[in-house]
Amino acid sequence: MLVIILGVIGLLASSNLVSSSTSTRVGGHLPLTFDPPENELGYWCTYVESCRFCWDCEDGICTSRVWGNNSTSIIENDYVKYCEVSRWGDLCRYDVEEHIYHSMNCSDPKPWNPYKIARKEWKKDKHFRKELKKDEF
């Protein structure tokens, strides 16, 4: 019985050490969510930038929630995906809408973007919003 208790205490202690060592980047545990904390968007969006929570989209044009108007705007299409993210200790995980999962060590993250081919940058001179007249509805 004592061995089991000591084992559980050891697991909890190692989990806390991992959490505290990564807390400067992402901090503690995070239950599965479509809406990570605002102060963590830079982290989550750096490694899987196609997640919808990384973008503010209006009228088919999306601007980065992390880098704002100073970044390239994109056209809203299949590139922008609904993602859920979670963190347990040093394991960060993305669950993308097609039941695709990407896991990584939070303290040693790696970019992952299989949807990059679908990304289309919006250029003001090339893509313009058409003003419709009443009879064009």
UniProtKB/Swiss-Prot annotation:
The lineage of its organism: Viruses, Varidnaviria, Bamfordvirae, Nucleocytoviricota, Pokkesviricetes. Keywords: Early protein, Glycoprotein, Signal. Glycans are attached at N69, N70, N105. Pfam families: v110. Residues 1-20 form the signal peptide. It comes from African swine fever virus (isolate Portugal/Lis 57/1957). This is Protein MGF 110-7L. Belongs to the asfaviruses V110 family. It comes from the Viruses.
